[in-house]
């Protein structure tokens, strides 16, 4: 491996294509002055991928993968709901065909029913494209629904690490047990089943 914190400028640019991010606030992370086509296609332009027609086609493909259609291309972020904005942010990450997507609290600003839809979308995209996710969240129900392996951090230090199944069934560290004790009784998996989205 290579230390990413030691890379700068031109040495870092090729790696940025492989590593994309989706942030917590789907409105704050989208430039309100740009159309959806410009927002999702910005990475393609920066990396010099394709001509205008090819970029538009790839943007439309990414939007369709997240459940949005062609008329969305010319619209602006304020014209969409929070869940739709997060889909736009996911399309922006997806359009470069990265190996890894950082998901920084991507569902925390959404209500539970929309969270379920976004979680199911992320699962489907992961299966389809073989994506790796680095998922940061305080919502343990969403963590349980998405994660395969988990790191538990306290005050910036890792206190426990393991598979999701092991950590949720047999937590070892007191802080992990404390966190699990705060989980709401109704699991996200139950919401997914009720919504007919699977688990």
Write out the residue ranges for each language-model feature.
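Conserved ABC ATPase signature
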Residues: 76-80, 84
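Conserved ABC ATPase "signature" region
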Residues: 3, 54-71, 180-181
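ABC ATPase NBD coupling module
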Residues: 3-20, 46, 166-171
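A short, surface-exposed alpha-helical micro-motif characterized by mixed small hydrophobic
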Residues: 143-145
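ABC ATPase "signature
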Residues: 161-162
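A short, proline-enriched helix->beta-strand linker immediately N-terminal to the Walker B motif
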Residues: 95-99
């Amino acid at each position: 491996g290579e230390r990413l914190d030691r890379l700068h400028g031109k040495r870092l640019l090729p790696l940025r294509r492989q590593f994309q991010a989706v942030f917590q606030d789907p409105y704050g992370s989208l430039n309100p002055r740009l159309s959806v086509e410009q927002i999702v296609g910005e990475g393609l332009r920066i990396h010099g991928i394709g001509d205008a027609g090819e970029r538009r086609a790839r943007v439309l493909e990414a939007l369709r993968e997240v459940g949005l259609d062609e008329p969305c291309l010319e619209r602006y972020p304020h014209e969409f709901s929070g869940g739709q904005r997060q889909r736009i942010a996911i399309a922006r990450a997806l359009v470069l065909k990265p190996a890894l997507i950082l998901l920084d609290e991507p569902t925390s600003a959404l209500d539970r029913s929309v969270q379920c839809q976004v979680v199911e979308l992320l699962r489907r995209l992961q299966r389809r494209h073989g994506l790796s996710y680095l998922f940061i969240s305080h919502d343990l129900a969403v963590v349980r629904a998405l994660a395969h392996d988990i790191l538990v951090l306290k005050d910036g230090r890792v206190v426990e690490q393991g598979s999701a199944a092991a950590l949720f069934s047999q937590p070892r560290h007191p802080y992990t047990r404390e966190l699990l004790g705060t989980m709401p009784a109704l699991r996200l998996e139950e919401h997914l089943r009720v919504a007919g989205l699977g688990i």
